[in-house]
A protein has these predicted regions:
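Short amphipathic alpha-helical segments and their helix-coil junctions
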Residues: 1-5, 77-80
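Catalytic Zn2+-binding segment of zinc metalloproteases
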Residues: 79-96
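Beta-strand-connecting loop/turn residues
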Residues: 42, 59-60
Length: 145
């Protein structure tokens, strides 16, 4: 019964997040060799050999080869952006995905040093229990003590 309930929950969430799940499935062949790191909160977390940073789309999150299971980047993606997607459903790409990828492409050109100051990233960090800190002029994530 527990397994059936889990499967029904996963299918419901997959359909609720269908647009971003489709984008994730279409992206997979371009992310290099994928290694499954974990499955938590109805989300598959993969390490991709051609990834730098991370991206979350529906039931799938992808991180760089340097990420580990306890890495803040993993938490940012799997516990932050995934929760956003689960809450927003079909609105996720409009509210988080498109603005977030645009921000990632432009923030340095716009003169910002802190990638995590944008609303999409701040909210993901809050959901994941993370905060930013500065070291040698660069911004990093850490778990809130």
């Amino acid at each position: 019964m527990k397994i059936l309930l889990h499967i029904l929950s996963f299918v419901s969430l997959f359909l609720w997040q269908l647009p971003q799940c489709i984008v994730a499935l279409l992206m997979m062949p371009f992310l290099g060799k994928l290694t499954l790191l974990s499955y938590e909160n109805y989300c598959f977390l993969f390490k991709g050999t051609k990834m730098s940073g991370g991206i979350s789309l529906g039931c799938f999150a992808f991180v760089s080869p340097s990420a580990s299971k306890s890495n803040p980047t993993k938490a940012h993606e799997q516990e932050g952006h995934v929760k956003q997607s689960q809450r927003l459903g079909w609105l996720y790409l409009i509210v988080i995905g498109i603005p977030g990828i645009t921000w990632a492409a432009l923030y340095k050109k716009l003169g910002y040093k802190n990638y995590y100051c944008f609303y999409t990233e701040k909210w993901a960090n809050k959901l994941a229990g993370l905060e930013t800190y500065i070291r040698n002029g660069n911004y990093y994530l850490k778990f809130i003590d």
